[in-house]
Structures are given as C-alpha cells and as structure tokens.
A protein has these predicted regions:
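Soluble catalytic domains of enzymes that build or remodel membrane lipids, polysaccharides, and related
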Residues: 1-191
Length: 191
C-alpha cells in the first residue's frame, strides 16, 4: 500500500488485519506518509527502502513461495506534475537499477505514477520485467482517479510488475473506498 499514515495503519490493526496478514513492513521517508507490505507468510529480510529511491521509501520483504524466494517491493514514485518532471524521471530510473540485481527475483507493486506509454516506465521494464496486466492479456487497467464525481478513471498508473519467468493470470481492478486509486488484484505463477 502507498501513502499510508500512522492513523491508517492503526485503523488497519484495529480492524484486525493481523488476523489475515500478520506480517508487515511499513516505512516512511518523511514521517507522515509511507508505504507498506502486508503478508500472510513471513517476510524475510525486511527493509525500509529496497530501492534507495529519492521519491519515497519503498519497503521490501522476501516471501517463500513453494521453495522459491520472491522479493516484494511496495512502489511509490514521484508524481509527474509541473516542476517535478526531473524528479519523476529520476524515481523511475532508480527503479530501473533493480534490473542489475540478478541474484533476486522481484514483484513490484504500487503507484508508479506512469503508464505503459511513458518511456521511463518502459525503460524500467527493459528486457527483464513485465507488466502483469499486459502479460495477462487484461488490457487497460485504469486505476486513477477514483474520487472524481464526473470523471471516470482514465490513467493506468498503478502496476504489478513481474520478474522474468513469472506468469500473470487473472487481473482485476477494484475500487477501494476512501482512496483516489483503485487496487489491482493479480494472480501470479512464479514458475
């Protein structure tokens, strides 16, 4: 999850998230908003910032999936708003450096603030990573904005990105009450 706050995490805990997803890694680079991972199975080697990103802390944790170690990372890059174009591109370029970490298999999830039409996002994917929605044949996954009364979701800026050799199955866009982003639910075969 992205843009978590202490109050939001407290409400998740009060609602009983730990009964379903008892393992978590939540971090904040500014002390206000953060990003988090929740898991039903233990998160090995949890880290506050796996990417060393200038945009935000992007926490990571490794999950054993049938004997395979898969590193999950919660992504939130800089928004491409006027005055922040360089920072936006840099935050995607920093993610692209992860292609060089060949000793680890990754699944990146979250708000990339970029669509497949953006060159920096495609550069991040390179020849190693794949967008799960495209891999699954789902097509467009418009996920933002969900909170506009007279405007439908028109931007697919949220993604689940898979490492090579993984296969995406079903992909579904789900509105989340109180959020301006929809969630993506994706089934993955890690192979």
């Amino acid at each position: 999850m992205q843009e978590t706050t202490e109050d939001f995490v407290k409400k998740l805990n009060e609602a009983g998230i730990e009964h379903y997803l008892p393992y978590a890694q939540v971090s904040s680079s500014d002390g206000v908003f953060g990003n988090g991972l929740w898991s039903a199975t233990p998160l090995a080697d949890p880290a506050d910032d796996d990417v060393n990103s200038s945009a935000s802390f992007m926490p990571g944790g490794t999950v054993d999936m049938g004997g395979q170690q898969i590193r999950f990372i919660s992504v939130h890059t800089t928004a491409p708003v006027p005055g922040y174009w360089r920072q936006w591109k840099r935050s995607l370029d920093e993610l692209g450096l992860m292609r060089g970490h060949t000793d680890t298999r990754y699944i990146f999830m979250g708000d990339f603030n970029a669509t497949y039409d953006h060159t920096p996002f495609r550069d991040f994917l390179g020849d190693r990573f794949v967008d799960a929605a495209r891999e699954s044949g789902h097509g467009f996954t418009f996920s933002w904005p969900t909170n506009r009364v007279y405007m439908p979701m028109f931007a697919g800026i949220d993604h689940v990105v898979l490492d090579q050799g993984m296969k995406a199955g079903q992909c579904k866009v789900v509105k989340v009450e109180g959020s301006d982003h929809a969630a993506l639910l994706v089934t993955v075969a890690v192979g």
